[in-house]
Amino acid sequence: GNPIIGEGKPENQNHAIIFCHGQYLQTLDMNQDNYLGEAYKMRNLLEGFTGNVRIIGFREHIFSESGGAVAHFAASNELVFGTMVQRFLAWPLRVRFHYGHPDVWDKVWAFSSGGVSKASRTLHVSEDIFGGLNAVLRGGEVEYEEYIHCGKARDITFTAANAFEQKISGGNAFQGLSRDFYRAGKSFDLFRLLSLYNTGTGLFASSTIMFWALYWFTLTIACLALIGLENFTVDTQGNLYSDLGRGGAQGDSQVYSAEWLIQLGFIMIW
């Protein structure tokens, strides 16, 4: 039969750990790059493995940015996530886990505590984050450093970029079904729990609600414009009048756009 039971990448990663030498392990991609000047900083980075620190991440330089408009978008996306976002996830939110390359692991700990990722087919679409969550649930800590970086290529075609976004969104959906996140929800404090939700599954849920709200908002504004309710008048008693039927503002009345009515802007009036 097929010797690969789960997803290929995490299966290979966890199987290869037993053949690695040394105390620390760095996860890389095939299109990863590095620079001699940055390699000299690795010794300083490894000094950060003190106490319960199990993972140390750092940023990447996307060298495929000049490959076109899609490549520029993918590089900009990775720049924001790999620097500003991950810096904030590590502290003060404390919800940065493992996102694959180029994180450095405590290999001795990972060797005996479940590996660097999980490989169940279908469920662990985003296999890397489960390795980091496993480390956190076992009492480990995740750090992030910015004084060192390595090179990385990103998608340069629309099809590849779209497939990557589908993988990320699908992986976040399955995270909500996993027992790992269930255990995290029971063990995290409220602030950390809300941070976990809004930086993971909740981000896509909020984006979906926002997109649908935008569609309905545009449709409602168009309908109000067609029936002559682009503006309305509110008098001092709070009564609402259409400018079409009243002929504009009178006396102490105030004129508002229809957007105020839809967005509950009357709260400011009361």
Predicted regions and their residues:
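Internal catalytic domains of large membrane-associated glycosyltransferases
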Residues: 1-208
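Basic/Trp-rich segment in TM-proximal cytosolic loops or flexible interdomain/linker regions
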Residues: 158, 167-270
